[in-house]
């Protein structure tokens, strides 16, 4: 990544990644139920609402096909943003987590997020060193979160990191840390 900024832990990295991506109070964020609680907690800390979609059998990560189906049935684009038709809440981000280092179908998520005007925030806490089609995980969205907790691939006993190739995001990250 062009920039990497350390923070206190992976939950904090997810929280700040969501904040940088424009998630606000009352928004909905799509993620997966098969994950560490930090993913849903980071969404909740912003007073946003986690929406759970199913995982793929082959990756054990969030299924872009299940997300697409859910969006087609429950969402609409209004004024350049995605909204839940039944709750009227803005759907501002999708957070796939690369379970046990198995990358989700990232090319599908990139297309889906562009089409539905939703930010892609990768939870790459379990996939440091993993590749998807020759590219490291954590580099497909504008921002990604890593964790160095004791049960992760690389550990410092704790700590997290935000990575981004987007210069606007990476410059803004420092403002949140300071």
Whereabouts are the PLM-identified features?
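PLP-dependent aminotransferase-like
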Residues: 19-99, 103-115, 119-124, 131
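Conserved active-site segment immediately N-terminal to the catalytic lysine
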Residues: 122-156
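Short acidic capping loops at alpha-helix termini that bridge into adjacent secondary structure
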Residues: 2-3, 25-28, 171-172
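Buried hydrophobic packing segments
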Residues: 13-18, 39, 160
């Amino acid at each position: 990544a062009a920039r990497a900024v350390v923070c206190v832990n992976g939950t904090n990295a997810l929280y700040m990644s969501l904040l940088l991506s424009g998630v606000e109070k009352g928004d909905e964020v799509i993620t997966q139920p098969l994950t560490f609680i930090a993913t849903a907690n980071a969404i909740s800390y912003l007073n946003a609402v986690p929406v759970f979609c199913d995982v793929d059998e082959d990756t054990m990560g969030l299924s872009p096909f299940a997300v697409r189906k859910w969006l087609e049935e429950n969402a609409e684009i209004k004024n350049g943003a995605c909204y839940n038709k039944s709750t009227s809440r803005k759907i501002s981000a999708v957070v796939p987590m690369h379970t046990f280092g198995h990358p989700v179908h990232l090319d599908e998520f990139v297309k889906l997020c562009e089409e539905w005007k939703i930010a892609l925030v990768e939870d790459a806490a379990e996939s440091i060193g993993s590749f998807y089609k020759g590219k490291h995980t954590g580099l497909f969205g504008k921002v990604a979160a890593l964790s160095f907790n004791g049960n992760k691939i690389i550990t410092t006993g704790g700590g997290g990191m935000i990575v981004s190739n987007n210069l606007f995001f990476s410059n803004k990250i420092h403002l949140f840390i300071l």
